[in-house]
């Protein structure tokens, strides 16, 4: 498993554990902003597999993962993040590329667990 996949799994465990303590019976919705189409789709699909493995290890039927395709596009990433917010998601894993983080500052009510930094220049 690549280092980024291990980090994602760790973030899921930490997020799920903390949310589970706060709301034991309530459904926990975690968003996943990843490229599922386009040139980077292989990375996105690998992350989906890693997240599903982590959720299976947690073995909590209250955790729901909501996938959104960013297509590695900043505007589509923002639109997908807003959709997740409308669906009640408060914690989002992703986006995974720094160019997709630039517009997410306006979504103050959501926590983004991104493995990138918007200050990194390509």
Residue ranges and their predicted role:
Residues 91-122:
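Extracytoplasmic ligand/sensor domains, especially the bilobed periplasmic-binding protein
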Residues 74-90:
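Short, well-structured alpha-helical segments in soluble
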Residues 39, 43, 47-54, 77-80, ...:
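Stable alpha-helical elements in mature extracytoplasmic
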């Amino acid at each position: 498993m690549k280092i980024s996949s291990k980090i994602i799994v760790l973030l899921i465990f930490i997020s799920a554990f903390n949310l589970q303590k706060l709301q034991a019976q309530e459904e926990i919705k975690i968003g996943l902003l990843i490229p599922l189409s386009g040139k980077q789709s292989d990375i996105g699909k690998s992350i989906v597999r890693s997240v599903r493995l982590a959720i299976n290890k947690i073995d909590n039927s209250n955790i729901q993962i909501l996938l959104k395709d960013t297509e590695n596009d900043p505007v589509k990433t923002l639109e997908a993040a807003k959709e997740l917010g409308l669906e009640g998601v408060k914690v989002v894993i992703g986006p995974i590329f720094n160019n997709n983080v630039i517009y997410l500052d306006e979504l103050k009510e959501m926590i983004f667990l991104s493995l990138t930094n918007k200050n990194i220049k390509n």
